[in-house]
């Protein structure tokens, strides 16, 4: 797995380089302190991941990531920065992670493990047919407290629309996503998630109990959570077919 580091502070660059070499099998093929130099390099070289600061000369990290997102081959991007206010932009660019300085070594080592696993999965996916069932290690990026949290998709219990935002719930956490529920639902595997209501989608694997409700609708009770998700009248027929009712 080939990676580059984009960081204009020499000591920070050296520290990150050491951590990558010490805790992963990744090959560092370049270190840069200037955004335009990175673009020139990527025109002739393919890498699998980029560790990217935001406050760098010539072209800041966010603009650099926007340019890279247009490439046919899109490397994983991990932002490592002191600027917490760009987390939502990083999410919109589908960054793999967003790490704030100063960081703990454990934060970097955990990210490296997940990144190598995601890259290995990507290599497998490129040579095998696309899976129709959610695998345990399939992940999605969720936003919490201006951080990007890489989350197993099957950890999601349900999502609820709030105006132009979507609240996403796992067993122990909640996340606020900067998108409407239709856009969020499009990122989920349809084999496991169902849009049961205009304001809700639910993980079918997390349903504990189905209770008939008014006007031939249903209320869904979920495993481990004290919450009821409605099924609207317009979705009842499709829901019955999915659940073989």
From Swiss-Prot:
Cellular component GO terms held in the UniProt record: cytoplasm
Coiled coil: none
InterPro entries documented for this protein: CheY-like_superfamily, LytR-like, LytTR_DNA-bd_dom, Sig_transdc_resp-reg_receiver
UniProt domain Response regulatory: residue ranges: 2-116
Domain (HTH LytTR-type): residue spans on this chain: 140-245
Keywords tagged on the record: Cytoplasm, DNA-binding, Phosphoprotein, Transcription, Transcription regulation, Two-component regulatory system
GO MF, any single term: phosphorelay response regulator activity
UniProt xrefs under PROSITE patterns: HTH_LYTTR, RESPONSE_REGULATORY
Localization per record: Cytoplasm
Keyword Transcription in annotation: yes
Reported modifications of this chain: Phosphorylated by YpdA.
Modified residues (4-aspartylphosphate): 53
Known role: Member of the two-component regulatory system YpdA/YpdB. YpdB regulates expression of yhjX by binding to its promoter region.
Protein name as annotated: Transcriptional regulatory protein YpdB
Species for this entry: Escherichia coli O6:H1 (strain CFT073 / ATCC 700928 / UPEC)
Organism lineage: Bacteria, Pseudomonadati, Pseudomonadota, Gammaproteobacteria, Enterobacterales
